[in-house]
From Swiss-Prot:
Name of this protein: Chaperonin GroEL
GO biological process: protein refolding
Pfam family, one: Cpn60_TCP1
Family, as annotated: Belongs to the chaperonin (HSP60) family.
UniProt source species: Lactobacillus gasseri (strain ATCC 33323 / DSM 20243 / BCRC 14619 / CIP 102991 / JCM 1131 / KCTC 3163 / NCIMB 11718 / NCTC 13722 / AM63)
Top-level taxonomy: Bacteria, Bacillati, Bacillota, Bacilli, Lactobacillales
Length: 543
């Protein structure tokens, strides 16, 4: 396909137009008085949201050159969301501020490469200062504050704090849509996986249609059990001890399943069989997790172990097991704390090393099941549109809270970035005049989020920023109440990781845009070059 190429000033001007179109749309949502944006869908009612990354992803511009500028800013927002889970609008505002100021200087004759060096120097100094002024999250109230600010709802903040208290900081917290209008929290203790009993005749509670086993032995294997003789010696020993048994296997079929069911119905002993969770390598890993949690051994050919040779001390144990038709929950596994802790560290390392979002999600699920259980926040609302909007906000709040637990928090409302600017301004020097220009560009951009928050609240952003520059650290403008106060004491805080990621990604994308000298895009199709329309077959030939 034919290409259009633009060079130097023309190229940068087109990219800047795209940057402005996307940023001007997204930045209206920043702060407590931020507005909503309505997004058209191909069918059904439009979405209404104030989530920066959702808006950024939905924007495609007609002009190819402008669209590339917009997509680069969208990447800064997306990357911030991937790393920290929030801060997408802040990243967009910072990118626009650095690009705009940088373009002015490049147009005036400054060297873009020198400016880029200055931007990188100033960003590193700002990030170091952010870490110095960061507070550690230590209490449930602080967790609730972070979540409340991100979601603009005290109710949601308290829900997330409750969830984290119950499942721990490494626990999985999932967000689901509720069928009612209330938003509520439920917690699944212990390890749960989505495999139910192989026969309904194994249930112990006919009203709830579930099987409850107290202090059972747990046989864990990746083999298929078809012949009851393979496990008969083991079953006889369990019957003699008067214990119940949970079998987790690749499958239980042939004569084995009806024999187990018959013994259960006769009251010989209590047994429930379920299929092993997951598939392939993930199944092996999950079986090993269950074995470590319960203090058992996976009976597998990979380890040279056979079912017929299995001893009772190779079985796992748990305080309680509940099996429904869809799920199995193991509570109070008897595994050693040291072995579980070692396994948790191993999974954390795998999470840090993986590049796949899907693998990361599955590893985090495994981590949570070992580390403390699963909490489910069920989001309710009166309409589907409101439900989607609330779900977006709660997801953002949850991500922001995790980020705060990881790296701490700083004063919110853009105050921390201005505090950083006040601390390092004058101390950070570029290695050339152009590099110093780059440093100054970042210093000026650090005030952009505060200006935008104030403007969205109907105030003069320049006046608010000027006032803030002469205030003590952590004193900021609370746009929600129109007051000047200590932001940390007022509970207006941002996760350090979110602020840091927003600044680093904005600086990275802005530096790339400023050093762009040529832009190549698909040329628009010319109507004249299109094939002529086929003749109407109904028209006859004149004779």
């Amino acid at each position: 396909m034919a290409k259009d190429i633009k060079f130097s000033e023309n190229a940068r001007r087109s990219l800047l137009k795209g940057v402005d179109k996307l940023a001007d749309t997204v930045k209206t949502t920043l702060g407590p008085k931020g507005r909503n944006v309505v997004l058209e869908k191909s069918y059904g009612a439009p979405d209404i949201t104030n989530d920066g990354v959702t808006i950024a992803k939905s924007i495609d511009l007609k002009d190819h050159f402008e669209n590339m500028g917009a997509k680069l800013v969208s990447e800064a927002a997306q990357k911030t969301n991937d790393i920290a889970g929030d801060g997408t609008t802040t990243a967009t505002v910072l990118t626009q501020a650095i690009v705009r100021e940088g373009m002015k200087n490049v147009t005036a004759g400054a060297n873009p490469v020198g400016i880029r060096r200055g931007i990188e120097t100033a960003t590193k100094a700002a990030v170091d200062e952010l870490h110095k002024i960061s507070h550690k999250v230590s209490t449930k109230d602080e967790i609730a504050q972070v979540a409340s600010v991100s979601s603009a709802s005290t109710e949601v903040g308290n829900l997330i704090a409750d969830a984290m208290e119950k499942v721990g900081h490494d626990g999985v917290i999932t967000i689901e849509e509720s069928k009612g209008i209330d938003t509520e929290l439920s917690v699944v203790e212990g390890m749960q996986f989505d495999r139910g009993y192989l026969s309904q005749y194994m249930v112990t509670d006919n009203d709830k249609m579930e099987a409850d086993l107290d202090n059972p032995y747990i046989l864990i294997t990746d083999k298929k059990i078809s012949n009851i003789q393979d496990i008969l010696p083991l079953l006889q020993e369990i019957v003699q001890q008067g214990k119940s048994l949970l079998i987790i296997a690749d499958d239980v079929d042939g004569e084995a399943l009806p024999t187990l069911v018959l013994n259960k119905i006769r009251g010989t002993f209590n047994v429930v069989a379920v299929k092993a969770p997951g598939f392939g390598d993930r199944r092996k890993a999950m079986l090993e997790d269950i074995a470590i949690l319960t203090g058992g051994t996976v009976i597998s050919s990979d380890l040279g172990l056979e079912l017929k040779d299995t001893k009772i001390d190779q079985l796992g144990k748990a305080g309680k097991v509940t099996v429904t038709k869809d799920s199995t929950t193991i509570v109070e596994g008897a595994g050693s704390k040291d072995a579980i802790s070692e396994r948790v560290d191993q999974i954390k390392k795998q999470i840090a090393d993986t590049t796949s979002d899907f693998d990361r999600e599955k590893l985090q699920e495994r981590l949570a099941k070992l580390a403390g259980g699963v909490a489910v926040i069920k989001v309710g609302a009166a309409t589907e549109t409101e439900l989607k909007e609330r779900k977006y906000r709660i997801e953002d709040a949850l991500n922001a809270t995790r980020a705060a637990v990881e790296e701490g928090y700083v004063a919110g409302g853009g105050t921390a970035l201005v505090d950083v600017m006040k601390s390092i301004q004058g101390n950070v020097k570029g290695d050339s005049q152009d590099a110093q220009t780059g440093v100054n560009i970042v210093m000026k951009a650090l005030g952009a989020p505060v200006r935008q928050i104030a403007e969205n609240a109907g105030k003069d952003g320049a006046v608010i920023l000027d006032h803030l520059e002469h205030e003590d650290p952590e004193i900021g403008y609370n746009a929600a109440t129109d007051k000047w106060e200590n932001m940390v004491k007022a509970g207006i805080i941002d996760p350090t990781k979110v602020t840091r990621s927003a600044l680093q990604n904005a600086a990275s994308i802005a530096a790339l845009l400023l050093t762009t000298e040529a832009v190549v895009a698909d040329a628009p199709e010319d109507d004249k070059n299109q094939a002529p329309a086929a003749p109407n077959p109904g028209m006859g030939m004149g004779m």
